[in-house]
């Protein structure tokens, strides 16, 4: 079975025993997390969310993506600005879908 959950403002299609990458979730590696914002499960559609359906996952890793460089330059002056950004993410393994 599969489900569509809402995590970090994004909708993700998940299946059991699948690994997903989400926006940063509070918690350490090895802890279990529960996603209760389930939009779709099998042939059931929520309005907006399904009650009594939960997705259980385990945090595998907290990390950051590769650095992106943001460079701003004003053409008619000597103003330049170079910034770097690394977006944090969480790797989660989906253990089961209850519902």
Curated annotation (Swiss-Prot):
Q: Mind listing the GO biological process terms from this record? A: translation
Cited Pfam families: Ribosomal_L21p
Matching InterPro entries:
bL21-like, bL21-like_sf, Ribosomal_bL21
Q: Which domain of life is it from?
A: Bacteria
Would you tell me the Gene Ontology cellular component terms? cytoplasm; ribonucleoprotein complex; ribosome
| GO MF terms, alphabetically ordered | rRNA binding; structural constituent of ribosome
Keywords, comma-separated and alphabetical: Ribonucleoprotein, Ribosomal protein, RNA-binding, rRNA-binding
Subunit composition and interactions = Part of the 50S ribosomal subunit. Contacts protein L20.
What HAMAP family is this protein classified in? Ribosomal_bL21
Q: What PANTHER family does its record include?
A: 50S RIBOSOMAL PROTEIN L21, LARGE RIBOSOMAL SUBUNIT PROTEIN BL21M
Entry's family note: Belongs to the bacterial ribosomal protein bL21 family.
Task of the protein: This protein binds to 23S rRNA in the presence of protein L20.
Question: What name does the UniProt record give this protein?
Answer: Large ribosomal subunit protein bL21
What is the organism field in this record?
Mycoplasmopsis pulmonis (strain UAB CTIP)
Organism lineage = Bacteria, Bacillati, Mycoplasmatota, Mycoplasmoidales, Metamycoplasmataceae
Instruction: Quote the gene name from the UniProt entry.
Output: rplU
């Amino acid at each position: 079975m599969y489900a569509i959950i809402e995590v970090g403002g994004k909708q993700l299609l998940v299946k059991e025993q699948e690994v997903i990458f989400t926006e940063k979730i509070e918690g350490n590696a090895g802890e279990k997390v529960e996603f209760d914002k389930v939009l779709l499960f099998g042939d059931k559609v929520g309005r907006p969310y399904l009650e009594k359906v939960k997705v259980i996952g385990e945090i595998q890793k907290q990390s950051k993506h590769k650095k992106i460089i943001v460079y701003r330059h004003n053409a008619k002056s000597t103003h330049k600005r170079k910034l770097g950004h690394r977006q944090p993410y969480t790797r989660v393994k989906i253990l089961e879908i209850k519902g």
